[in-house]
Structure formats: C-alpha cells, structure tokens
Swiss-Prot record:
The organism's taxonomic lineage, starting at the top: Eukaryota, Metazoa, Spiralia, Lophotrochozoa, Mollusca
The protein's role, per its UniProt record: The metallothioneins are involved in the cellular sequestration of toxic metal ions.
Protein name: Metallothionein
Positions that bind Cd(2+) 4: 45, 59, 65, 73
Protein's organism: Crassostrea virginica
N-acetylserine PTM positions: 2
Binding site for Cd(2+) 1: 15, 19, 32, 36
Length: 75
C-alpha cells in the first residue's frame, strides 16, 4: 500500500496532521491547499508583483502563478 503522505506515488495529496513534515513528498502535480499541514506541500511565488503575482499569496503551483514567462513557483 502506498504511503498516503507521498503524493508522488499516490497522485493525491493526503497530507494532514498525521503526516510528518519530512515524510510528505509532494510533487509538481500536487495541488495542496492552505490547510495543508505538510511543509513539503507549500510553494511560494518567486516572481515580482510587477509581473502580476503577489509573491507567496494564493500561489499553489506553476498553474496559479500568473506572471511573465520568467516567473517560477518553487517549493
């Protein structure tokens, strides 16, 4: 049985209080919400607000980062 804290294997992020921060391996396809307790699920925008993205706000992955082509979201 796959580790529920490892969404790279399961394809779903089931991170919760029961998943240790170091045990949840979230991949690029893992769209974790703000209520996700796993540190590995958190991503931040590494772009400037001039590009249309307020860094660290409502950015849960590359798909939600509304910036120029040089923008990237990273863990």
């Amino acid at each position: 049985m796959s580790d529920p804290c490892n969404c790279i294997e399961t394809g779903t992020c089931a991170c919760s209080d029961s998943c240790p921060a170091t045990g949840c391996k979230c991949g690029p396809g893992c769209k974790c919400g703000d209520d996700c307790k796993c540190a590995g699920c958190k991503v931040k925008c590494s772009c400037t607000s001039e590009g249309g993205c307020k860094c660290g706000e409502k950015c849960t992955g590359p798909a939600t980062c509304k910036c120029g082509s040089g923008c990237s979201c990273k863990k």
